[in-house]
């Protein structure tokens, strides 16, 4: 840990550096591990450098001590929650097979009681994908979430657990199902919640319509900047590819900067662009999608090209559907007006349609 934090901070030139803890479940490492992490970060940070901390957790182990630590160190929490109880508990069970919703909600209330900032990370899967508005309204109205990420579950059906094969498990979300899920929530959000609730894929999409680079690697032309470090110092090309063939090396044996800048890692990032099928290159929504995450590019195009994203049909219908309102919000921004004005514009349009 000392070696990684020292090397990571020394390699940064930006005035603000983010240290992110995720797993597995990071809280299993115990609170002392994170206290030590902060101690090292404060020790090695450069003059004038600000350190931001984030943690992705399922929330089941949180208590007052954890929440005091988060508040004292201004840790931004990403809380894994898949919607109302019956949807969350469909797949999020503990090692004994017991449901976890009540424990997660207890953790959420502790975060709120201690004034800890949190985002919601919701997996979209077979158990909740058919109930988009119920999921969204639960987050918005019941728990008061202001920042929401939706992560589509695309899980390969194999024995290795690696990104191999072209079959998916029964709990994976369907492509068209995911597109419909996003469209239903977008219709609610764009009429009522712009500027009040931040949904990551909507914000990223707006950036694409404005012509700005995506903040998400999955919607960028190339990738390779979301490396994964294991507790033993092993560094992998991506947190979706923690597999032997994507091992770059160990930071205890070779400097972090050297591993990040290897030809192997550079090729990994460029492969996203270089292997993009012609079907995608000629697509009208390529500017917003860029082929999606490489981990999901395992089906064929209608013309038989390999490397099409499993979620293509869903992404395509979603990006096509949001084109007009996104173009309107992009125009508002270019004229130094708030994107939230779209709500009044659509309200007026909807009234005219009613007559």
PLM regions with names:
Residues 32, 65, 103-106, 130, ...:
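Generic recognition of stable, solvent-exposed alpha-helical segments in well-folded globular domains
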Residues 1-20, 29-155:
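Radical SAM/AdoMet-radical enzyme domain recognition
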Residues 242-355:
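Flexible mid-to-C-terminal extensions adjoining Fe-S/redox cofactors in radical SAM and related proteins
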Residues 231:
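A cytosolic small-molecule/anion-sensing beta-strand core signal
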Residues 2, 90-102, 109, 113-218, ...:
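Radical SAM enzyme [4Fe-4S]-AdoMet core and its adjacent flexible, acidic
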């Amino acid at each position: 840990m000392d070696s990684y934090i020292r090397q990571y901070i020394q390699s940064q030139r930006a005035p603000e550096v983010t240290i992110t803890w995720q797993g597995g479940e990071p809280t299993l490492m115990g609170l002392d591990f994170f206290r030590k992490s902060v101690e090292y970060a404060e020790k090695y940070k450069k003059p004038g450098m600000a350190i931001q901390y984030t943690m992705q957790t399922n929330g089941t182990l949180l208590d007052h001590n954890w929440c005091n630590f988060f508040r004292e160190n201004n840790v931004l929490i990403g809380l894994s929650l898949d919607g109302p109880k019956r949807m969350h508990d469909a797949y999020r069970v503990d090692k004994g097979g017991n449901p976890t919703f009540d424990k997660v909600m207890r953790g959420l209330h502790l975060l709120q009681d201690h004034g800890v900032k949190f985002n919601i990370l919701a997996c979209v899967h077979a158990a909740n994908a058919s109930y988009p508005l119920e999921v969204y309204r639960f987050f918005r109205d019941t728990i008061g979430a202001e920042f929401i990420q939706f992560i589509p579950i695309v899980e390969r059906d194999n024995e290795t657990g690696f990104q191999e094969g072209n079959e998916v498990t029964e709990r994976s979300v369907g492509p068209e199902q995911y597109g419909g899920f996003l469209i239903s929530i977008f219709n609610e959000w764009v009429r009522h919640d712009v500027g009040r609730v931040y949904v990551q894929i909507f914000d990223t999409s707006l950036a694409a319509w404005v012509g700005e680079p995506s903040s998400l690697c999955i919607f960028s032309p190339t990738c390779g900047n979301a490396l994964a470090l294991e507790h033993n110092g092993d560094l992998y090309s991506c947190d979706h590819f923690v597999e032997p063939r994507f091992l770059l090396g160990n930071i205890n044996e070779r400097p972090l900067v050297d591993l990040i800048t290897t030809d192997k890692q550079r090729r990994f990032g460029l492969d996203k662009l270089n292997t993009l099928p012609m079907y995608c290159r000629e697509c009208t929504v390529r500017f917003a999608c860029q082929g999606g995450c490489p981990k999901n590019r395992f089906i064929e195009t209608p013309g038989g090209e390999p490397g099409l994203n499993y979620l293509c049909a869903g992404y395509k219908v979603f990006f096509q559907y949001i084109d007009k309102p996104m173009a309107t919000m992009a125009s508002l921004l270019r004229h130094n007006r708030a994107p939230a004005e779209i709500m009044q514009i659509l309200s007026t349009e909807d009234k005219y349609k009613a007559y």
